[in-house]
């Protein structure tokens, strides 16, 4: 009976773990669009020019592909300037295909797709940006983690919550 009790306890723990996990399946991740511009090279690569000012813009979009599958696109644009001259511009749209359970409510699906999905995509997008800037002759641009909850809240306040999956 001890073995049976232990097995039942393990099964119960497994069910609890599964029920508390995020109801999001990552089907694919990919670079949707990518650009690196180094408009003032080689002058911008000369030493002793000081740290560049980085302007970072981030957007998240989601669109349904069918009832349970959606594409989420994390778009980033970073422009580095020194002395009012552009050092580099990197633009990346990094996407993922995600599946949610059919019974999930639309507002919950919207929040998951615009908060949790980009949170999963971000480390990969960050690595691509870092490698691109390094390959462009600069130190790697290491983006700090982003607050996708705050980005989502601002989107809801700015555009209103109409229940459709969209931008954050």
From Swiss-Prot:
Localization of this protein: Cytoplasm
Gene Ontology terms describing biological process: protein folding; protein tetramerization; protein transport
NCBIfam families linked to this entry: PRK05751.1-3, secB
PANTHER family listed in its UniProt record: PROTEIN-EXPORT PROTEIN SECB, PTHR36918
Pfam families the record matches: SecB
InterPro entries for this protein: SecB, SecB-like_sf
Main function: One of the proteins required for the normal export of preproteins out of the cell cytoplasm. It is a molecular chaperone that binds to a subset of precursor proteins, maintaining them in a translocation-competent state. It also specifically binds to its receptor SecA.
Region annotation Disordered: where it falls in the sequence: 1-20
Name under which the protein is recorded: Protein-export protein SecB
UniProt main location, coarse: cytoplasm
Keywords attached to this entry: Chaperone, Cytoplasm, Protein transport, Translocation, Transport
Record's subunit section: Homotetramer, a dimer of dimers. One homotetramer interacts with 1 SecA dimer.
Family of the protein in this entry: Belongs to the SecB family.
GO cellular component: cytoplasm
Species of origin: Rhodospirillum centenum (strain ATCC 51521 / SW)
Any one GO molecular function term: unfolded protein binding
Gene3D superfamilies according to UniProt: SecB-like
Domain of life where this protein originates: Bacteria
Secretion signal, residue range per the UniProt entry: none
């Amino acid at each position: 009976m001890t073995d049976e009790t232990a097995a039942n306890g393990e099964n119960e723990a497994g069910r609890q773990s599964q029920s508390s996990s995020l109801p999001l399946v990552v089907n694919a991740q990919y670079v949707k669009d990518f650009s690196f511009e180094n408009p003032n090279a080689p002058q911008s690569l000369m030493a002793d020019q000081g740290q560049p000012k980085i302007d970072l813009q981030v957007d998240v979009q989601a669109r349904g592909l069918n009832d349970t599958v959606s594409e989420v696109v994390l778009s980033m644009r970073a422009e580095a300037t020194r002395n009012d001259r552009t050092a580099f511009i990197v633009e990346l749209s990094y996407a993922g295909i995600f599946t949610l359970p059919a019974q999930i409510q639309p507002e919950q699906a919207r929040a998951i797709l615009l908060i949790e999905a980009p949170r999963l995509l971000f480390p990969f997008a960050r690595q691509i940006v870092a490698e691109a800037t390094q390959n462009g002759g600069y130190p790697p641009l290491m983006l700090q983690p982003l607050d996708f909850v705050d980005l989502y809240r601002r989107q809801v306040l700015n555009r209103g919550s109409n229940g459709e999956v969209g931008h954050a």
